[in-house]
């Protein structure tokens, strides 16, 4: 979903196809590979879509009141300082340091990266309407008619989290859902959960997982 991560996702898909993946599927099982759902970001090596939206924050319900991230509003100006003058940068560093001292590192990570819908020019902006990429993915999901299926697994490749060279299996389902227990049953105790605080990632707003759950 993040364009620049398409290189990693494409490599995984090619590896699967070139090493007998389709031929080795058990009877009654299908695998759907969705390639480059954010083609603009992939082509221009950017995280965001052509609308300058973080696709993995764009699955909020725009018919309802959007999720709020007050921490982001507090640090937005420090994250994107008005100039690169020494005094401005020092003040920005001081604001961020004060936020961390008051709320902790993990709270800062969530404030910065959890997603926000208040600053279109800011980091991790979730947009004000469904993007083309979101609508395209939702149309793919609807075409799969997945609800009658006995089991459905969704693997979404991301990069830049956790130890170097390690693929962390992250479950973003809310705690208590059957999906969380199922993920651990399938992939073992190495599965981490954002809501439980066991993941290198903090909880996120408006993730693509919501698009699957709505179907």
Residue map of PLM features:
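Structured catalytic-domain cores with a bias toward divalent-metal coordination
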Residues: 1-215
């Amino acid at each position: 979903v993040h364009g620049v991560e398409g290189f990693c996702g494409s490599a995984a898909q090619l590896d699967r196809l070139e090493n007998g993946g389709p031929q080795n599927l058990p009877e009654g099982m299908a695998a759907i590979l969705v390639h480059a759902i954010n083609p603009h970001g992939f082509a221009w090596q950017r995280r965001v879509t052509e609308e300058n939206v973080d696709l993995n924050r764009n699955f909020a319900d725009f018919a309802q009141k959007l999720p709020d991230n007050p921490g982001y509003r507090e640090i937005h100006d420090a994250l994107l300082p008005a100039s690169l003058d020494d005094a401005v940068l020092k003040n920005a560093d001081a604001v961020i340091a004060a936020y961390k001292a008051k709320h902790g590192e993990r709270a800062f990570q969530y404030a910065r990266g959890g997603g926000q819908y208040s600053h279109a020019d800011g980091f991790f902006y979730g947009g004000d309407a469904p993007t083309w990429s979101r609508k395209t993915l939702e149309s793919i999901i609807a075409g799969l008619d997945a609800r009658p299926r006995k089991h459905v697994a969704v693997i979404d490749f991301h990069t830049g989290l956790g130890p170097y060279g390690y693929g962390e299996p992250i479950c973003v389902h809310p705690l208590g859902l059957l999906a969380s227990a199922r993920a651990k049953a399938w992939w073992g105790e190495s599965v981490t959960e954002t809501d439980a605080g066991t993941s290198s990632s903090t909880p996120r707003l408006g993730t693509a997982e919501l698009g699957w759950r709505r179907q």
